[in-house]
Amino acid sequence: MSKLLVIALLLLPLINHGIYLATAWDDQDFFKYCPPSKCSQHGPMIRYPLCLESSNTSSSSSCGCAGRSIWKLACSGQDTILVHPVLGPYSVSAIDYRRSSMKITPLVDPCLVLQQKLIISRSSSSPQVDVINDEKPSFDENFFESSSATIVHCSREFTPAAAHADSIAGPVSCLSNTTHFFYLVNSDEDMSILPLDCKVVPVSDRGGISLPHMLKDQMFYNFTETAKKIPSFAETAVSWDEGDCRECELSGRRCAFSSQRDREFCMPDPHGSHIKVIAATSSVAAFVALLLTVATVLYLSLKTRYNAEIHMKVEMFLKTYGTSKPTRYTFSEVKKMARRFKEKVGQGGFGSVYKGELPNGVPVAVKMLENSTGEGESFINEVATIGLIHHANIVRLLGFCSEGMRRALIYEFMPNESLEKYIFSDDSNIFQNLLVPEKLLDIALGIARGMEYLHQGCNQRILHFDIKPHNILLDYNFNPKISDFGLAKLCARDQSIVTLTAARGTMGYIAPELYSRNFGGVSYKADVYSFGMLVLEMVSGRRNSDPRIGSQDDVYLPEWIYEKVINGEELALTLETTQEEKDKVRQLAMVALWCIQWNPRNRPSMTKVVNMLTGRLQSLQMPPKPFVSSENELMS
């Protein structure tokens, strides 16, 4: 809360200042008669002590633009122009009134302008500079910070002595040639420092060329640096004579001019009814900004604390987990392993999956947990459930990374991706050629054996809660492997019912009891239901919500398959099937219909499912309708 108090104290002056502006000035408004102006919508604002060239003489006089040492700017189309009598026109891109400076860029090469004005007499070796009034007198040399430069013509090149190196610049490359060498010399210097063959080039009616002081990081260049930069074709900053306006502008007010008193004065910026509205608005905006700042700081503080708690929870788990396999990697190792995450091969519920390679050349899949929820639960679930088990039908976890809030899981790579790719493919040839009845049975049996191991073969029972085609990966030989244990839950092997705070899984595969306890308690039978829905999709090649089933758009997939089986109709999608293949598909469908019984007590265990699929049960009875019979049974 101390941080919030500091921020509030910092913003309170802003609010007070807005209130002050709304009431501080109720006098004749200078800006009402001398409003700021622009040459274009995005051009710099032009206001006192600068003036825009205007034909309105009376307005110029009352606004302090007539007969005073100020810069007068002009508009040329959309550009704001400042004209130098010798160096030519400049475009003004920005004006900073608080620092009394502006950024200017030559519209034409200053050196070229100077060349055109430099007249070398054919009969004399003494050049002259013609600066007779061929430009508008918009550049008052008494107004800006400047140095006077004298143009010097020499018959040979020379190097200034070290004591005078800051006062002599040249030779100016764009003016000089093999017989004429031109230098710019600070007019404050005695010309006796020059070689005898050097002559001053006369400038009409002037003692020299006025070079505006160039700024860099609010520091003035010295004479030599300025003289070298002036001929360059680049944007630069120049400063004008500050006078009394600088202190006024720095205090947050505006410099103005009183025509009656013929002097400058300082006033709020601006004032009157218009500023009252602006000030009131700014006060409200400042208050809103304060609230947003407080809310942001509070959010970031809570988020930081939340992330720290998650990090501590994960680290405590990993400390308890020990140093046994899988291997823990640093994030830099994971990034190198995944080739900087260039090859994305999939997207899961908790993050993206990238193809990578271990240092020994073994291909791997790297899952970056981007949307991990439940206080790091998905990461902990994955490591805790499959980190120490090894089964032919469960994807193997080879390593992991937990570094700050960045977490990754490294699995064995499955080249044939997920089962979903094949059973829902728009290319019917894929389904017909790869997922023939024999292969369908092998895949279903492999999944069933993997689930049986999770439910019965480990020290603790592992409930997956997200069995679906997307989470069944296929290896080189199309052997299935169960993956994605982000929603998994561990429980004792003798624990029949587990407690959940919310339903888990994917719509279409979630058992009824996860939605309503009227169907019974949540147990490993929820996974059996998901397996049944998966197998129904395998034998039909369609999603359980696919409207293309049958002739009616609203036919429920289990109901459609049940009617097919009970009426002895074919389910296989291959063009030609033997009677044996038809029987295998029918067997798969009957097992699936047993698995999706609404009453969990009527569903078989995965051990019994394996026996059903292997034919160990001699007579497989037709199950009751899972969507009618079970409901009636539960209601009776």
Curated annotation (Swiss-Prot):
The keyword Transmembrane applies. Residues 298-636 are cytoplasmic. GO terms for molecular function: ATP binding; protein serine kinase activity; protein serine/threonine kinase activity. GO terms for cellular component: plasma membrane. InterPro entries: Kinase-like_dom_sf, LRK10/LRL21-25-like, Prot_kinase_dom, Protein_kinase_ATP_BS, Ser-Thr/Tyr_kinase_cat_dom, Ser/Thr_kinase_AS. Its EC number is 2.7.11.1. It catalyses: L-seryl-[protein] + ATP = O-phospho-L-seryl-[protein] + ADP + H(+); L-threonyl-[protein] + ATP = O-phospho-L-threonyl-[protein] + ADP + H(+). The chain crosses the membrane at residues 277-297. Belongs to the protein kinase superfamily. Ser/Thr protein kinase family. This is Rust resistance kinase Lr10. It comes from Triticum aestivum (Wheat). The gene is LRK10.
